UniProtKB/Swiss-Prot annotation:
Its main location: secreted. Residues 1-6 form the signal peptide. Ca(2+) 1 binds at residues 183, 267, 372, 375. Belongs to the venom metalloproteinase (M12B) family. P-I subfamily. The lineage of its organism: Eukaryota, Metazoa, Chordata, Craniata, Vertebrata. This is Snake venom metalloproteinase H2. Residues 7-176, 378-400 form a propeptide. Binds 1 zinc ion per subunit.
């Protein structure tokens, strides 16, 4: 090991066993290439367990919609909408070279932060809080001291035990016509805004990292997740956020249909809150409700200092909107892995949807064909010019 640490406080909490690494960028820009702040592709070398690895990263170009907006409120209650330039963002996905099964979801905004899978093991990486140092900590999630060993659960309680998929995953034909595009609005309520001390940059980084993580998981379901807007209830809540997840979900859905849907083009909205929901519940969503003005919503508690765990809860609730139910014990996403649609969130890094989730999502889409997720939105890196005919559907799209 270059250096082995016994215990340190990182953003994810107190980590008992970690390795200090110094990632070295090895990308060579092509001759004459324009230097972006964050290149489209980057490679970093560092050591894990004393062994050199090469992390290959590619920018997640479809992360933001072309008309992405951020909304907050002034002290006198006025809504302030901005359209920040997000083309040159710092969110990447990738893999470890020479490991076919590896994946990575990384933000490169200030050092490397995120997670990667190497030889079947998931590692977290983040910069260490040492001034003028390139030092990063690499560790397994199991080495993070758990704040709370109590079970955390999704609040969807319908009993789907009788649900049997019509087809096996291997019988489903997959083609490009299965690809869907979900434009999502994330709403951060006032309790969460206060939790992060009103630091909107910190909140944005937290949310973007989550979306980058879940977009990787949703690729397996042939669904692109695109952020249309981030709204922060900076002055006060615009609905009554209660400890009852059911009441909060109902209020949020009604608010979306009455307000949000009329000013932002999107297909689905999720509320992030620091409110501690009753009992073990950390999230709730309507099932099979995509594109419905009141019901294409979910509520998620910001329940962990580990970004990945909140991200997976978000992925879980969105999947309910897509007609996906909780996994039964016969569902699998690979040997030894807990899958995203497990009704209980346990203390491990989860990345994958199960075979059951895949089948249920495909069946819901082929049976219901929710119309709002059919169109491919313009990406931030697309330069649009007026065209004749229907080539640019975006301009006249009728949402929901």
């Amino acid at each position: 090991f270059p250096y082995q640490g016994s215990s340190t406080i990182l953003e994810s909490g107190n980590v008992n066993d970690y390795e200090v690494v110094y990632p070295r960028k090895v990308t060579a820009l092509p001759k004459g290439a324009v230097q972006q702040k964050y290149e489209d592709a980057m490679q970093y070398e560092f050591k894990v367990n004393g062994e050199p690895v090469v992390l290959h990263l590619e920018k997640n170009k479809g992360l933001f919609s072309k008309d992405y907006s951020e909304i907050h409120y002034s002290p006198d209650g006025r809504r302030i909408t901005t359209h920040p330039l997000v083309e040159d963002h710092c969110y990447y996905r990738g893999h470890i070279r020479n490991d076919a099964d590896s994946t990575a979801s990384i933000s490169a905004c200030n050092g490397l932060k995120g997670h990667f899978k190497l030889r079947g093991e998931t590692y977290l990486i983040e910069p260490m809080k040492i001034s003028n140092s390139e030092a990063h900590a690499v560790y397994k999630y199991e080495n993070v001291e758990k704040e709370d060993e109590a079970h955390k659960m999704c609040g969807v309680t319908q009993n789907w035990e009788s649900y049997e998929p019509i087809k096996k995953a291997s019988q489903l034909i997959v083609s490009t016509e299965f690809q869907r595009y979900m434009e999502i609005v994330i709403v951060v309520d006032h309790s969460m805004y206060t939790k992060y001390k009103g630091d909107s940059d910190k909140i944005k980084a937290w949310v973007y990292e989550m979306i980058n993580t879940i977009s990787e998981s949703y690729r397996y379901l042939y669904i692109d997740i695109i952020v249309s807007a981030l709204e922060m209830w900076s002055e006060k809540d615009l609905i009554n956020v209660e400890t009852s997840a059911e009441n909060t979900l109902k209020s949020f859905g009604e608010w979306r249909a009455k307000d949000l849907i009329h000013r932002i083009s999107h297909d689905n909205a999720q509320l992030l809150t620091a409110t501690d929901f009753d009992g073990p519940t950390i999230g709730l969503a309507y099932v099979a409700s995509m594109c419905d003005p009141k019901r294409s919503v979910g509520v998620v508690q910001d329940h962990s200092s580990v970004n990945h765990l909140v991200a997976i809860t978000l992925a879980h609730e969105i999947a309910h909107n897509l007609g996906v139910h909780h996994d039964k014990s016969s569902c699998s996403c690979g040997s030894g892995y807990t899958c995203i649609m497990s009704p209980v969130i346990n203390s491990e890094v989860i990345k994958y949807f199960s075979d059951c989730s895949y089948i249920q999502c495909r069946e819901y889409i082929s049976k219901e064909n929710p119309p709002c997720i059919l169109n491919k939105p313009l990406r931030t890196d697309t330069v649009s010019t007026p065209v004749s005919g229907n080539e640019l559907l975006e301009a006249g799209k009728d949402y929901d």
